[in-house]
Design a protein with these regions (language model features):
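Metal- or metallocofactor-binding catalytic centers and their adjacent structured scaffolds
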Residues: 12, 17, 49-127
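Short glycine/proline-enriched loop/turn "hinge" motifs that connect secondary-structure elements
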Residues: 38, 136-138, 167
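Conserved active-site and cofactor/substrate-binding residues in soluble primary-metabolism enzymes
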Residues: 41, 66-69, 73, 87, ...
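Glycine-rich, aromatic-flanked loop segments that form ligand/cofactor-binding clefts
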Residues: 117-153
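Structured beta-strand/loop patches that form or line metal/cofactor-binding pockets in enzymes
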Residues: 8-52, 57, 61-63
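N-terminal accessory beta-strand-rich subdomains and adjacent acidic, glycine-rich linkers
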Residues: 6-7, 24, 37, 70-73, ...
Length: 196
């Protein structure tokens, strides 16, 4: 069975404190989506400090600036429950799910828990002096990546140039394209333009 004890052959880590910072990063290409236009990208940076001196880090991308404060408060609230306790990811998850029963186990609270979970796994991998993939039983290696930094719901006549620029930016062989125009025919036309 998949248990924290079976996975981790490392020292036990204990939560000492958590540091949460926020940032807003200007985008090279504004996001144009059904929910509106975004010119900046909010980030929540999470550092979990352990009594053993290991720092686990993670970050969240909450999309909407207005949700940042609520997520930060939820992260702090959850982290306060585990101060001075062992950082065992599955135990932290289970205890968090129990404590979130009345306020809800979705949306902002689950996003907050995800940030804590990633930082814990980062700390455990650092303590074991192994890549996280190895700690989880896998092996690190190259993965195929694609550029997601564009091709939002922009006018069709802008898509070909943007797709070419996205491929060139990092020598990518693929790009991510967003759909959701007024009609399915417009989406099909957009796909055809980008494929060229």
């Amino acid at each position: 069975s998949f248990t924290t004890k079976a996975l981790l052959v490392t020292q036990q880590l204990t939560l000492e404190k958590i540091q949460i910072r926020t940032a807003s990063v200007p985008l090279n290409r504004p996001i144009v989506a059904k929910v509106g236009q975004l010119k900046d990208w909010p980030l929540i940076l999470i550092d979990i400090y352990t009594k053993e001196g290991v720092v686990g880090r993670s970050y969240l991308e909450p999309y909407r600036q207005r949700s940042v404060a609520a997520i930060v408060h939820s992260i702090q609230d959850l982290a306060d429950m585990f101060k001075g306790k062992p950082l065992a990811p599955l135990d932290v998850y289970a205890e968090s799910m129990r404590s979130l029963h009345l306020v809800g186990r979705e949306g902002i609270t689950l996003i907050a828990l995800a940030g804590i979970d990633m930082a814990i796994w980062d700390a455990l991998a650092k303590a074991a002096n192994k890549p996280l993939a190895t700690l989880l039983g896998g092996s690190p290696g190259p993965i195929r990546a694609y550029n997601t930094n564009g091709l939002w719901l922009k006018p069709l006549d802008e898509l070909a140039d943007e797709a070419a620029a996205l491929v060139e930016e990092g020598n990518y062989s693929a790009v991510k394209m967003r759909l959701g125009r007024e009609t399915i025919q417009q989406d099909a036309q957009a796909i055809a333009i980008v494929r060229e």
